[in-house]
């Protein structure tokens, strides 16, 4: 009985940590799932100047900027990137774990398409 309780607790911790890096879980107030299937997840993201995300992970993704914004990304390897977008800019990334911060004077408003592993 005690062994089953310990195993159940360990399994629950593993399941919680598996979702801990999901941006929808870490920053649900900023991300909204627009579509999800076995190949992609489409997200709308909005934040305000000065706001910061918790650390999270994206698989390979494409971002489309709905308006101009400026962000700082702190990557887990210690690098810090500054990215500035104009309305209509598009960016592809192989995926990364990061903390994002709006360092501009306008809201960040993007559509993000995360690419899931899939077989043709």
Label the predicted regions.
Residues 58-77:
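Glycine- and acidic-residue-biased ligand/ion/polar-headgroup-sensing regions
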Residues 68, 95-118:
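Ligand-binding loop in jelly-roll beta-barrel domains
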Residues 36-39, 77-95:
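Short acidic-glycine-tyrosine-enriched beta hairpin
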Residues 1-6:
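Bacterial N-terminal signal peptides that target proteins for export
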Residues 50-53, 91-101:
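Histidine-centered metal-chelating micro-motifs
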Residues 11-18:
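Hydrophobic h-region of N-terminal signal peptides that target proteins for export
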Residues 27-52, 59-63, 113:
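A short glycine-rich, His/Asp/Glu-containing loop-to-beta-strand
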Residues 19-27:
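Cleaved targeting-peptide boundary
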């Amino acid at each position: 009985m005690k062994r089953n309780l310990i195993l159940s607790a360990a399994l629950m911790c593993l399941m919680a940590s598996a979702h801990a890096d999901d941006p929808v879980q870490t920053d649900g107030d900023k991300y909204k799932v627009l579509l999800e299937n076995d190949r992609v997840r489409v997200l709308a993201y909005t934040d305000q100047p000065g706001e910061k995300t918790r650390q999270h992970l994206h698989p390979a993704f494409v971002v489309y900027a709905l308006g101009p914004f400026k962000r700082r990304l702190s990557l887990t390897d210690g690098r810090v990137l500054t990215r500035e977008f104009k309305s209509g800019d598009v960016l592809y990334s192989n995926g990364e774990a990061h903390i994002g911060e709006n360092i501009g004077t306008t809201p960040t408003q993007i559509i993000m398409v995360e690419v899931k592993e899939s077989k043709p």
